[in-house]
Amino acid sequence: MPLLPLLSFARTIARTVATGCVLFAAGAAAAEPHVRIEAPAAGATLDAMEQNRLVYEVDPGPRGDHVHVYVDGEEVGILRQLRGSYTLETLSPGDRELCVKVVNKAHTPIGVQQCVKVRVD
């Protein structure tokens, strides 16, 4: 069997593997840990007399375990689902900051979070 077709085939395989590795690496980079608060939107006005819902989606990454919910820096909830909603207790009127933070198994924030500022009337 001639050696030239084998070398050509080997080069094609090597390029395919290299391209696949680059695509895999790019896909892995796209899956960075994140928190996304889908509702309420930043700047929204919430009704103080209603139960308001915080809708979220999280990828905790390899260092994260679950998430905590904060209102004005005070922890108000622990969430184990990566996607869902959380009913906020009655909020007093004024400007409020709602945060979802990824924490590790020791309940320590790992720096992956999102916060939104809202107005409660």
Predicted features and spans:
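Short, compositionally biased P/S/T/A/G/V-rich stretches that sit at domain boundaries
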Residues: 31-47, 121
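Short acidic/polar inter-strand loop motif in beta-rich domains
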Residues: 104-111
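Short beta-strand segments within Ig-like beta-sandwich modules, predominantly Fibronectin type-III
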Residues: 76-82
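Surface-exposed, short loops/turns at beta-strand junctions within beta-sandwich domains
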Residues: 89-95
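Beta-strand signatures of extracellular beta-sandwich domains
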Residues: 66-70
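Short strand-edge motifs at loop-to-beta-strand transitions and within beta-strands
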Residues: 84-86
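Aromatic/hydrophobic beta-strand junction motif of beta-rich domains
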Residues: 53-60
